[in-house]
A protein has these predicted regions:
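Conserved nucleotide-sugar donor-binding
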Residues: 82, 149-165
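Short, acidic, metal-binding catalytic loop of nucleotide-sugar glycosyltransferases
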Residues: 29-39
Length: 337
């Protein structure tokens, strides 16, 4: 396995914003402790604030007048000079030492095949087996799988990551409505861990549907408080508050959806007396203020409808939606060339 100075190949991109500056000290405290390559450059993507941490090479990339997430992401990526980038979010708090061997191995695998887009830390929810263990501990994500584009930690080929972003995209839109863009590039290959234990970073996301770190802008203290106490990290939880409730979305019935004020996650609706999609949408709009893109898999009997829903840009009215079914992806691609 070829080894050389990793800083020539890899940059760390930490996606954040000024409003989350209180996360930076605990994030970089743990990053410095558990990340083995101190000389690898780090880009902190935020609007206007500056930050430094002793022993780490951090450069803040600012977009003070730009509110669009996609535009800020493209600006940050344009400042990355290395071929590969490790994508991280500001609440991905490392829990264990990162293996040098694993990182070098992934970089060398990517060098050996220029069509590899990423090696992710997130096991894919798909049950399909595809190129399992071609790269030990990983499997290839099947073409056109949902959430192939995602904001989980991953080592990306910088050029390909930049290729998939759009200036107006939010993170939620990018993971869902823009996911069909991968069909325009069938040559690209995406790999994910076979199991969580195979991930090359441990940042606390252990099972599909878990919430950890920061959720809806508030601390998930069930996750972070034991970690911060173990690591002797002091955090003022009052700055952003504590998330008061557990995840309520799994196995939620349409008949009880009134308990949910808004939805930003995949919602499983089952065992409902409501039989038509029209009735479901009417029920959701009655009880939920939905202002951002989301994807809802509806389980009605044995039939699965995957509906992609987004508010039309011309109006902020919650009643205006566009629906893109899987079978309509070709039309979507042709309109986004």
């Amino acid at each position: 396995m070829q080894k050389k100075n990793l800083k020539d190949d890899l940059t760390i991109l930490v996606c954040s914003c000024d409003a989350y500056a209180d996360l930076w000290n605990p994030f970089f405290t743990l990053f410095k402790k558990y990340w083995p390559f101190r000389d690898v450059p780090i880009i902190l993507n935020t609007e206007s604030k500056n930050f430094s941490f002793d022993g780490l090479d951090i450069k803040c990339i600012h977009s003070p007048s730009e509110k669009r997430y996609g535009k800020r992401m493209l600006n940050a990526l344009s400042n990355i000079k290395t071929k590969y980038v490790l994508l991280l979010l500001d609440d991905f708090f490392l829990r264990k030492p990162v293996s040098e061997e694993n990182i070098f191995q992934i970089i060398n695998w990517m060098k050996s095949d220029k069509n590899i887009a990423y090696f992710s830390c997130e096991p894919s929810p798909t049950y399909a087996s595809y190129e399992v263990n071609k790269y030990p501990g990983f499997k290839r994500v099947p073409p056109a799988s949902d959430y192939t584009l995602n904001m989980q930690a991953a080592i990306w080929q910088t050029k390909i990551l930049k290729e998939f972003w759009r200036p107006s995209a939010t993170p939620w839109e990018w993971e869902t409505i823009y996911n069909p863009l991968i069909l325009k590039h069938p040559e690209h290959k995406f790999y994910c861990p076979i199991h969580s234990k195979d991930s090359f970073l441990d940042y606390g996301h252990y099972a599909y549907g878990d919430i950890w770190g920061v959720y809806r802008g508030k601390w998930v203290t069930e996750d972070v408080d034991p970690l911060f106490k173990k690591e002797n990290i002091e955090v003022d939880y009052s700055i952003r508050g504590i998330y008061p409730e557990k995840m309520v979305f799994k196995n939620e019935s349409v008949d009880t959806i009134s308990s949910v004020s808004s939805i930003y996650a995949e919602t499983h609706l089952g065992n409902s007396s409501v039989k038509s999609l029209g009735d479901i949408f009417a029920r959701l709009k009655k009880f939920c203020e939905i202002r951002s893109f989301l994807e809802l898999p509806f389980y009605i009997g044995y039939e699965v409808h995957r509906i992609i829903k987004t508010i039309l840009k011309k109006s902020m009215l919650d009643n205006y939606f566009t629906y893109i079914l899987k079978k309509e992806r070709k039309r979507f691609l042709s309109s986004n060339k």
